[in-house]
Amino acid sequence: MKLTNYTDYSLRVLIFLAAERPGELSNIKQIAETYSISKNHLMKVIYRLGQLGYVETIRGRGGGIRLGMDPEDINIGEVVRKTEDDFNIVECFDANKNLCVISPVCGLKHVLNEALLAYLAVLDKYTLRDLVKNKEDIMKLLKMKE
């Protein structure tokens, strides 16, 4: 399964913020430049992450963004489920769009559904804290001050 850029960027933003010193504010420009991602895309991602409570946005002079909850409370499987818009990895997963003639007897959709559930189950085992255990290395690569 391939994650959308939206989910990829969401996870990267969370990793970036988790690698920051606790309470430190970051900004969209800084994250966009670090990852070479469009600021416009990141604004949408960060807005949604804020709605979900994963990030806190502080407006105005001296404002910025930071994690809205502890990294150990941010489950990766949950983030993926909330940022991916479509888990229909094959046509037959969507009853409204399914035109496959063998769908009623096909075993493939059951195998793929099992694989999708296993994929999500693995993601459910991890939190954001798990992804930043090597925080010092991440900070160096992101060129953050320790």
From Swiss-Prot:
One of its GO terms (cellular component) is cytosol. Coiled coil: none annotated. Pfam families: Rrf2. Binds 1 [2Fe-2S] cluster per subunit. [2Fe-2S] cluster binds at C92, C100, C106. GO terms for biological process: regulation of DNA-templated transcription. GO terms for molecular function: 2 iron, 2 sulfur cluster binding; DNA binding; DNA-binding transcription factor activity; metal ion binding. Residues 28-51 bind DNA. This is HTH-type transcriptional regulator NsrR. It comes from Bacillus subtilis (strain 168).
